[in-house]
């Protein structure tokens, strides 16, 4: 059977930036990497209900700068910035260097694979029918301008005795096109029947010009040009 490579990993340096952007000497690399892992683990646990999409980490001049991309910045910041100050102190303690925390708002959570996967997982935990949750996520993404979306759920769907996988796709999701901007992420729903895995692929268009184009327009990316539909090969 054919296996699917992680869409983010295969596009790193082509159309996808790294989530940790720092350079370290050989003796510091392991401790920095371990620090990044611990910081992310802590923030994801603390901000489990804050709709966090991703966390990017930079390390300028013996300090750490953490950018939290979230759809609900008010929850992260807290009243008069109290919560974000607590997070800053905790991150500085974990990393062992002075910390700075920036908050970036995710304008369209329906087009973010992590937030869509978490939304489907939370619906499954509330006993919403899996087909309804999948279809709703697909419709919302397409309505807000996605070029294509695929959602897959795996596990004891509907409490069935035998685990299985079901998926739903709308539009184009070209996994082999490296210039395609594909957002991919996963989540887990912990139900009374066991764990149900959720995978989401969202195709937002094609990025022409590679990383240089992303650097010039970090937020807005060009939409994919319309192409004629491909044939199905020889019959």
Swiss-Prot record:
GO terms for cellular component: cytosolic small ribosomal subunit. Coiled coil: none annotated. The gene is rpsC. HAMAP family: Ribosomal_uS3_B. This is Small ribosomal subunit protein uS3. It comes from the Bacteria. PANTHER family: 30S/40S RIBOSOMAL PROTEIN S3, SMALL RIBOSOMAL SUBUNIT PROTEIN US3C. Disulfide bonds: none annotated. GO terms for molecular function: mRNA binding; rRNA binding; structural constituent of ribosome. SMART domains: KH.
């Amino acid at each position: 059977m054919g296996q699917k490579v992680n869409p983010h990993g295969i596009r790193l340096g082509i159309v996808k930036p790294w989530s940790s952007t720092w350079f370290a000497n050989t003796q510091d690399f392991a401790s920095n990497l371990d620090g990044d892992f611990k910081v992310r683990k802590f923030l994801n646990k603390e901000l489990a209900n804050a709709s966090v999409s991703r966390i990017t980490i930079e390390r300028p001049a013996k300090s750490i700068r953490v950018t939290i991309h979230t759809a609900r910045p008010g929850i992260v910041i807290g009243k008069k910035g109290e919560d974000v100050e607590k997070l800053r102190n905790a991150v500085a303690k974990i990393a062992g260097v002075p910390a700075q925390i920036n908050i970036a708002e995710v304008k369209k959570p329906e087009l973010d694979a992590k937030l869509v996967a978490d939304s489907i997982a939370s619906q499954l935990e509330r006993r919403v029918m899996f087909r309804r949750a999948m279809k709703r996520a697909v419709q919302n993404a397409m309505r807000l301008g996605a070029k294509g979306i695929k959602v897959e759920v795996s596990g004891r769907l509907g409490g069935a005795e035998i685990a299985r996988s079901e998926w739903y796709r709308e539009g184009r999701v070209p996994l082999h096109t490296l210039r395609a901007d594909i957002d991919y992420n996963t989540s887990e729903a912990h139900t009374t029947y066991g764990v149900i895995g959720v995978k989401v692929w969202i195709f937002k268009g094609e990025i022409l010009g590679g990383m240089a184009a992303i650097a010039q327009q970090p937020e807005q990316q060009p939409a994919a040009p319309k192409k004629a539909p491909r044939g199905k090969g020889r019959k």
